[in-house]
C-alpha cells in the first residue's frame, strides 16, 4: 500500500485546458517573473495596467470545462440543428469537399495556422496555391487579373461598385443593379453606397437598360449571371449599351456555370465578382467562403485586397510574393483602394485545390450533372402542369404557382428538403453537386406531381442558349491536369506545405497579430456536418443549435468587453470597423447631427482605421503621436476644439499600437464625449486586456474584436477572420441587420455589411469553445502571461537593442518594439536584413516597420513556452553580434550573412565566394542541422515583381534554368 492514496474524485479530473493553452508552466513563469522583477502575475499586471482602467470584478462567465466536456456540449448544440437537403440556392450550395483536401488543407495546421504571406520567402507553398486560385478565377471569368480572395460575394460586389466609381468616367453617376441580382448582394451594396453618397438604382435589365435610367449619368452596372431567379440571359447587349453610356460593367458570375457558359470577359465585362463556395467549401451557415474579383488588366493596380504575383529571388529563380502592396490599406490608409486586410486565404486555397483536383473536365462534368438534374426536375413539373418561369437556366428553376407557394415549401420541408419561397406565387429550387434522384422525387411530391427520371432524362433537352455556350478552353496550365489521383494530390499538398512556415513549425512573433494556439479541440467541430452543411437562409427553427451558440458567444464577448450588445456579422476586423463606424454615423444622424463627420485617428493607428472611416463617409483628421509613443494630448485637445461641432468619433487602439498601456486613456475618452463625439476603441490588442480591463467601462462606445487574434480562430494564412462589433446600448439600434434573416439584427439597423446574416458562422464554434474551455479566470491568466512574455523578451533584448516605448513601471503591454534605426545608421544593416536573417535561425520575423519605420514589433502571446521564447531571444542576440561584425568591418557591408539572408540548401554545394562561411550562412549559432528549416527561395526582388506584373500560373518554360 502507498502512503498516500489519491481520491477517485481527483483522478477523474482531466488536466485543465488552461495548462494546454498557456505555454509557460508555473516553474517557467517564476523564472520569467524574476527576470522582469515581479513576484507574481497579479503583481506584474497591477504595475503594468493603469489603475483608472482596471476591472476589479471577476469575469461573469461559466467556469472552465475539460476538452471532453466542451466537445460534448458542442455535440448537444450541433444536434439541435436540422440539416435538410438544401435547394435554396442564392449563392450557397451543397458541395463535396474532397477528403484529401479536407484532411490535408482544412484540418491541417500547416495551412490554417500560417499568417498573411508578408514574408514571401517562407510562404511559397501558400502563394503558389493562391496563384492557382487566381488563375482559376481569371480563366473561368475570361478576365486577366484576379485577386487572391475577397470576403464574400456581397462585399466583392460592393468593392466593384467602389472600383467603378474610382476608375470610371462618370464618377458621380448612379450605380445600376440588376433586379435579378442576389438579394443579399443588393442589400450589401446599398449599405456600402449610402455613406459615400452613391445612388443605387435597382431595375429590371432583362430587356436592356430602361430609357429613364439611360437618360441619367451612370457610373457602373451590376449584372447577375445567371440571375437569382435562375434565368440565363444574353447580357452582352446590356454590357455594350452600358459602355456606350460611359459606365463600367460588373458581372456577378457563378464559376461552376462558367464552365458551360460564355465568360463575362468574352461578353465585354470590365469586372467579375462572385463566390467560390461551391468549389468544395461547406456552406457553414453562411461562411467563411472565398469571394473573388477579376478585372480587365487596366484595373489591376486598383484591385482591392491581396494580389499574388511572380518575381525572382536573388539567384534569379522564380518566386512568388504579394504584388502591388502600395495600394493597400496598411500603406495607403485613407487613400487605399479598400479597407480589406484579412480576406479568405484558407478557403481560397481549398477552392483552388478543388479545381486542381477535378481539372476542367471534372468541373464540366459536375456542371453538366447539376444542369441535368435541374432540367429533369423542371421537365417533370412542366409535365404535371406547373408553369416554369424561364426557358433558359443553369441550376436554379423558378416556378409560378399562384397562391400555393407557402404550402409547397412546407410540403418540401416535410420531405426533408428546403426550397426557396420567393413570394406567395413563386417557388424556386437550386440543384448542385450533391443533388440526388431522391431529391428530385421529393420536389415533385411537394408540388403534387409525379414523374419518371429515366424517361425525362431521355426527353429533356439542354436549356442553355447555344449562342451562350462556352467554346474556349480554360484551366489549361499543367497544374490543373497533373493531380487526378489522390496520391498525386496528397503529395502536391505536402510539397507546398513544406515550403511554408506556420505555427506548427515554430513561433510567429508578429506584433499586433496575436499568433496564439489554435487548439485541435476548438477546431474539430468546424467540420461536423451539423455546423458545416446548414444553409444561411434556412428557417430559424432548423438552426436552433447555431442560434444558441451565437447568442451565448455574443453575451460572453459583451461581458469580456463591457459592452451591452455584440454583432457577429462582420467577417473580418476591417468589416467590424466599418460596422462600428456606421453605428456611430447612424446615432449622430438619428440625433439630427448630420454634420458630425470628422473622425480623429492617431498617426500610429492601423491602416484599416482610416480606410474604414472614409468608407463610412467620414473625414479623417490625423492626431500626432508624442515621442513616448502615446497620443499627443495637446494636439488631440487642439483638434477636438477645432472640430468640436463636427466631431463624430475618435478611433484609438488600446493598448496602443506602440505596445503600451496609455495612462490617460480615460481622460481622452472624457474629452471626446464632452465635445459630443463617440470613442471607438480598436480591439486589435484586446489580448492584453481580457480579464484586466473592459473598453466599454473605461470610455469606449464601440469596439471591434478580432476573434482570429484574441479568441483563437486561426489566421489561415490570411483569413478567415471574424470581427464582431460591440457597442454601448445607445448605439445598439444601429448594428448590422439582414433582409433575409430578421433575427440577425435590429429592425433599425444600418443594413448588412456581410452577405450572410451571421457572417462566417461556421467558425464561431472555435471561439465559443475557447471561452468555454478557459473560463473567466483562465482568460485572465492568458492575458497576464501574454503581458509577462512580452516583458520577458523586452528585458532580455534590452541590453542588445533599444526597446522603443514603455508604459507604467517601465513595462510594455503584450508586445514590444525594438529599435534598429541606430544600428542601421551605423552599419547599414536594415530591418529587412534582420527579418530575413531570422529565417536562417528558424523564425518568422516580427512585424516590420509598424508602427514605426525601421523597427521590429514583437508579440509572443501566452501560448509560447519558455524554451521557444529563449530560442528567439538567443537568435536575436546572435544577430546583434553579427551586426557588430558588419559594423567593425569583419564582414563587408555588402557581403555578410544578414545581407545574403535567407540562405537555401543550395548554399551547401557549388562555388562559394562570400566573406562568410557556408556554416555561418546556414547553421548560425544555436541552429541544429537535424531541425533546420530550409527556405525554398532566397530573398525575393520586390521591385521586379511589380515592374513585371504576372498574377497567374507562369508557363512551363518559366520553370526551366
Curated annotation (Swiss-Prot):
Q: Which cofactor does it need?
A: pyridoxal 5'-phosphate
The record's keywords, sorted A to Z, are: Oxidoreductase, Pyridoxal phosphate
The record ties this protein, via Pfam families, to: GcvP2_C (PF21478), GDC-P (PF02347)
Q: What do the Gene Ontology cellular component annotations say?
A: cytosol; glycine cleavage complex
Which reaction equations make up its catalytic activity?
N(6)-[(R)-lipoyl]-L-lysyl-[glycine-cleavage complex H protein] + glycine + H(+) = N(6)-[(R)-S(8)-aminomethyldihydrolipoyl]-L-lysyl-[glycine-cleavage complex H protein] + CO2
Residues bearing PTM N6-(pyridoxal phosphate)lysine: 709
Tell me which EC number(s) this protein carries: 1.4.4.2
The top EC class, named as a word, is oxidoreductase
- The disulfide bridges present are none
- Name the Gene3D superfamilies for this protein: Aspartate Aminotransferase, domain 1 (3.90.1150.10), Type I PLP-dependent aspartate aminotransferase-like (Major domain) (3.40.640.10)
Q: Which domain of life is it from?
A: Bacteria
Q: Which PANTHER family match?
A: GLYCINE DEHYDROGENASE (DECARBOXYLATING), MITOCHONDRIAL (PTHR11773:SF1), GLYCINE DEHYDROGENASE, DECARBOXYLATING (PTHR11773)
- State the family it belongs to: Belongs to the GcvP family.
Q: What is this protein called?
A: Glycine dehydrogenase (decarboxylating)
Q: Which organism is it from?
A: Streptomyces coelicolor (strain ATCC BAA-471 / A3(2) / M145)
Q: What is the lineage of its organism?
A: Bacteria, Bacillati, Actinomycetota, Actinomycetes, Kitasatosporales
Which gene is this protein's source?
Answer: gcvP
Amino acid at each position: 500500500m502507498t502512503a498516500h492514496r489519491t481520491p477517485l474524485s481527483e483522478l477523474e479530473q482531466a488536466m485543465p485546458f488552461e495548462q494546454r493553452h498557456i505555454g509557460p508552466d508555473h516553474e517557467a513563469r517564476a523564472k520569467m517573473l524574476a527576470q522582469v522583477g515581479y513576484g507574481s502575475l497579479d503583481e506584474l499586471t497591477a504595475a503594468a495596467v493603469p489603475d483608472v482602467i482596471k476591472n476589479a470584478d471577476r469575469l461573469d462567465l461559466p467556469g472552465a470545462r475539460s476538452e471532453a466536456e466542451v466537445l460534448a456540449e458542442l455535440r448537444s448544440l450541433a444536434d439541435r440543428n436540422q440539416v435538410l437537403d438544401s435547394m435554396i440556392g442564392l449563392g450557397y450550395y451543397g458541395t463535396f469537399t474532397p477528403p484529401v483536401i479536407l484532411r490535408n488543407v482544412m484540418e491541417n495546421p500547416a495551412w490554417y495556422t500560417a499568417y498573411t504571406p508578408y514574408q514571401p520567402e517562407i510562404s511559397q507553398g501558400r502563394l503558389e496555391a493562391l496563384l492557382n486560385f487566381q488563375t482559376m478565377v481569371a480563366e473561368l471569368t475570361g478576365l486577366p487579373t484576379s485577386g487572391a480572395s475577397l470576403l464574400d460575394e456581397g462585399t466583392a460586389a460592393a468593392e466593384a461598385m467602389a472600383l467603378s466609381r474610382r476608375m470610371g468616367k462618370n464618377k458621380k453617376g448612379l450605380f445600376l443593379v440588376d433586379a435579378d441580382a442576389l438579394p443579399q448582394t443588393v442589400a450589401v451594396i446599398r449599405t456600402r453606397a449610402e455613406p459615400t453618397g452613391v445612388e443605387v438604382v435597382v431595375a429590371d435589365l432583362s430587356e436592356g437598360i430602361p430609357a429613364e435610367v439611360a437618360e441619367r449619368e451612370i457610373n457602373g452596372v451590376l449584372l447577375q449571371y445567371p440571375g437569382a431567379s435562375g434565368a440565363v440571359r444574353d447580357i452582352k447587349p446590356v454590357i455594350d449599351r452600358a459602355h456606350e453610356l460611359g459606365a463600367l460593367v460588373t458581372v456577378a458570375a457563378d464559376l461552376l456555370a462558367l464552365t458551360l457558359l460564355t465568360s463575362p470577359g468574352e461578353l465585354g465585362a470590365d469586372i467579375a465578382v462572385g463566390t467560390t463556395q461551391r468549389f468544395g467549401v461547406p456552406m457553414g451557415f453562411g461562411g467563411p467562403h472565398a469571394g473573388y474579383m477579376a478585372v480587365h488588366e487596366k484595373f489591376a493596380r486598383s484591385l482591392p485586397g491581396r494580389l499574388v504575383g511572380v518575381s525572382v529571388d536573388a539567384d534569379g529563380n522564380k518566386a512568388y510574393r504579394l504584388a502591388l502592396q502600395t495600394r493597400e490599406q496598411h500603406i495607403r490608409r485613407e487613400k487605399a483602394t479598400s479597407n480589406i486586410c484579412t480576406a479568405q486565404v484558407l478557403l481560397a486555397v481549398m477552392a483552388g485545390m478543388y479545381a486542381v483536383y477535378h481539372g476542367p473536365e471534372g468541373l464540366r462534368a459536375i456542371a453538366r450533372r447539376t444542369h441535368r438534374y435541374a432540367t429533369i426536375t423542371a421537365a417533370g413539373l412542366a409535365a404535371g402542369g406547373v408553369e416554369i418561369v424561364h426557358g433558359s437556366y443553369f441550376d436554379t428553376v423558378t416556378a409560378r404557382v399562384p397562391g400555393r407557394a407557402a404550402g409547397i415549401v412546407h410540403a418540401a420541408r416535410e420531405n426533408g428538403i428546403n426550397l426557396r419561397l420567393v413570394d406567395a406565387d413563386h417557388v424556386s429550387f437550386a440543384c448542385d453537386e450533391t443533388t440526388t434522384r431522391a431529391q428530385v422525387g421529393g420536389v415533385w411530391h411537394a408540388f403534387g406531381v409525379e414523374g419518371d427520371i429515366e424517361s425525362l432524362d431521355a426527353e429533356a433537352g439542354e436549356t442553355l442558349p447555344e449562342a451562350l455556350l462556352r467554346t474556349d478552353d480554360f484551366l489549361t496550365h499543367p497544374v490543373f491536369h497533373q493531380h487526378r489521383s489522390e496520391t498525386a494530390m496528397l503529395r502536391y499538398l505536402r510539397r507546398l506545405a513544406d515550403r511554408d512556415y506556420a505555427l506548427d513549425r515554430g513561433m510567429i512573433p508578429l506584433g499586433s497579430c496575436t499568433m496564439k494556439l489554435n487548439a485541435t479541440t476548438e477546431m474539430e467541430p468546424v467540420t461536423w456536418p451539423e455546423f458545416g452543411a446548414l444553409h444561411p437562409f434556412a428557417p430559424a427553427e432548423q438552426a436552433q443549435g447555431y442560434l444558441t451558440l451565437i447568442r451565448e458567444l455574443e453575451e460572453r464577448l459583451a461581458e469580456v468587453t463591457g459592452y451591452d450588445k455584440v454583432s457577429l456579422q462582420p467577417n473580418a476586423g476591417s468589416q467590424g470597423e466599418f460596422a462600428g463606424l456606421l453605428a456611430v454615423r447612424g446615432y449622430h444622424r438619428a440625433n439630427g447631427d448630420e454634420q458630425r463627420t470628422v473622425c480623429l485617428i492617431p498617426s500610429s493607428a492601423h491602416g484599416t482605421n482610416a480606410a474604414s472611416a472614409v468608407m463610412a463617409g467620414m473625414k479623417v483628421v490625423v492626431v500626432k503621436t508624442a515621442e513616448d509613443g502615446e497620443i499627443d494630448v495637446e494636439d488631440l485637445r487642439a483638434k477636438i476644439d477645432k472640430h468640436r461641432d463636427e466631431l463624430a468619433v475618435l478611433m484609438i487602439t488600446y493598448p496602443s499600437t506602440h505596445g503600451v498601456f496609455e495612462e490617460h486613456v480615460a481622460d481622452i475618452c472624457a474629452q471626446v464625449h464632452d465635445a459630443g463625439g463617440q470613442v471607438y476603441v480598436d480591439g486589435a490588442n484586446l489580448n492584453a486586456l481580457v480579464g484586466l480591463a473592459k473598453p466599454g467601462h473605461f470610455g469606449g462606445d464601440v469596439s471591434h474584436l478580432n476573434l482570429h487574434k484574441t479568441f483563437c480562430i486561426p489566421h489561415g494564412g490570411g483569413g478567415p477572420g471574424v470581427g464582431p462589433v460591440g457597442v454601448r446600448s445607445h448605439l445598439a439600434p444601429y448594428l448590422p441587420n439582414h433582409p433575409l434573416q430578421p433575427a440577425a439584427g435590429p429592425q433599425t439597423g444600418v443594413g448588412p455589411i456581410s452577405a450572410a446574416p451571421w457572417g462566417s458562422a461556421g467558425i464561431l464554434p472555435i471561439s465559443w469553445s475557447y471561452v468555454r474551455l478557459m473560463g473567466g479566470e483562465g482568460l485572465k491568466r492568458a492575458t497576464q502571461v501574454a503581458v509577462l512574455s512580452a516583458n520577458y523578451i523586452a528585458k532580455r533584448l534590452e541590453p542588445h537593442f533599444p526597446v522603443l516605448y514603455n508604459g507604467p513601471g517601465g513595462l510594455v503591454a503584450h508586445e514590444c518594439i525594438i529599435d534598429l534605426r541606430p544600428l542601421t545608421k551605423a552599419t547599414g544593416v536594415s530591418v529587412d536584413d534582420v527579418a530575413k536573417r531570422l529565417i536562417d535561425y528558424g523564425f518568422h520575423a516580427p512585424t516590420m516597420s509598424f508602427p514605426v519605420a525601421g523597427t521590429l514589433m514583437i508579440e509572443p502571446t501566452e501560448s509560447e513556452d519558455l524554451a521557444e521564447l529563449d530560442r528567439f531571444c538567443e537568435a536575436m542576440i546572435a544577430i546583434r553580434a553579427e551586426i557588430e561584425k558588419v559594423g567593425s568591418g569583419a564582414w563587408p557591408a555588402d557581403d555578410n550573412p544578414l545581407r545574403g539572408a535567407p540562405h537555401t540548401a543550395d548554399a551547401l554545394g557549388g562555388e562559394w565566394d562570400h566573406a562568410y562561411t557556408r556554416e555561418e550562412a546556414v547553421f548560425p549559432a544555436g541552429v541544429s542541422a537535424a531541425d533546420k528549416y530550409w527556405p525554398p527561395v532566397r530573398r525575393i526582388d520586390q521591385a521586379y515583381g511589380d515592374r513585371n506584373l504576372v498574377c497567374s500560373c507562369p508557363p512551363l518554360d518559366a520553370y526551366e534554368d
